[in-house]
Structures are given as C-alpha cells and as structure tokens.
UniProtKB/Swiss-Prot annotation:
Protein name: Small ribosomal subunit protein uS12
Protein's gene: rpsL
Alphabetical list of PANTHER family matching this protein: 30S RIBOSOMAL PROTEIN S12 FAMILY MEMBER (PTHR11652)
SUPFAM superfamilies: Nucleic acid-binding proteins (SSF50249)
Pfam families documented for this protein: Ribosom_S12_S23
NCBIfam families: rpsL_bact
GO molecular function: rRNA binding; structural constituent of ribosome; tRNA binding
Species of origin: Mycoplasma mycoides subsp. mycoides SC (strain CCUG 32753 / NCTC 10114 / PG1)
Protein keywords: Ribonucleoprotein, Ribosomal protein, RNA-binding, rRNA-binding, tRNA-binding
Subunit composition and interactions: Part of the 30S ribosomal subunit. Contacts proteins S8 and S17. May interact with IF1 in the 30S initiation complex.
Domain of life: Bacteria
Length: 139
C-alpha cells in the first residue's frame, strides 16, 4: 500500500487493455491505401488453407480450421465449428471473434450458413450458431 507522498509523486497507472481479436479492430481504406481504426463485429475473407490441427493436452481430436486472408489484408486462423464442412481453398467466408481454448493461435470462428459456408447438415437443436433453417413440420 503506497503512502500519500508516494501517490503525490507518481499517480496510479490505469491498466492497459489489449483486444482479444485484433483483426476485427482494423479496417483499410482502399482509396487512399491507409489503415483505419474502424472496428467491425465480423470480417469477410478468402480461405488460403483448410486443414486440421491437434488440440493441447489433455484433449485429443482433429479440429478443423481455415487460414483466412481478410479484406483488411491480415491473415488469421479461424475455427470451423460443427460436424462436416464444404470449405476449400478460395472459399469466401465470414469470421467472428471468439477463441478456441485448446487450439493455440486460433482466435476467430467461421460463421456457418453465410457466403460460401453451408450450414451443418441434419442439425435440429442449437441451429442458429450453425446456419441451419427451421425444418419443415410434417403433417
């Protein structure tokens, strides 16, 4: 605990805050080729690589991810949620923030059911996160 004199000499410093999804906080003005600080909730990008990765201990699986070049010029790794996907190289995807705890370096998620990404087939519960329309009711 500092004394009053110590606080008079040196003020308390506010903690510096660092964003968890830096690629979403950077835009680019293509007319003047300048980086802007306009943040966005999602970004569009093109897949440069679609592959699998093994998670950290103690988990074991083959998690699907895509390397995505965004419209602001950055290249990031994005997790592909759900069972099965149709993504290939050059697929156009929409990404959102949100890390995958057991995959190092993966801080974004691909949004299913938009652009070139199809929704998860035969999904009936928790559909909105996986881009699935409401199934038709049989009479």
């Amino acid at each position: 605990m500092p004394t009053i004199n110590q606080l008079v000499k040196v003020n308390r410093k506010a903690k510096t805050w660092k964003t968890k999804a830096p690629a979403l906080n950077r835009g680019i003005n293509t007319l003047i080729k300048k980086v802007t600080k306009i943040a966005s909730p999602q970004k569009r990008g093109v897949c440069t690589r679609v592959a699998t990765m093994t998670p950290k201990k103690p988990n074991s699986a083959l998690r699907k991810y895509a390397r995505v070049r965004l419209t602001n010029g950055m290249e990031v790794n994005a997790y592909i949620p759900g069972e099965g996907h149709n993504l290939q190289e050059h697929s156009v995807v929409l990404i959102r923030g949100g890390r995958v705890k057991d995959l190092p370096g993966v801080r974004y998620h691909v949004i299913r059911g938009t652009l070139d990404t199809q929704g998860v087939a035969k999904r009936s519960q928790g559909r909105s996160l996986y881009g699935v329309k409401r199934p038709k009711v049989k009479k």
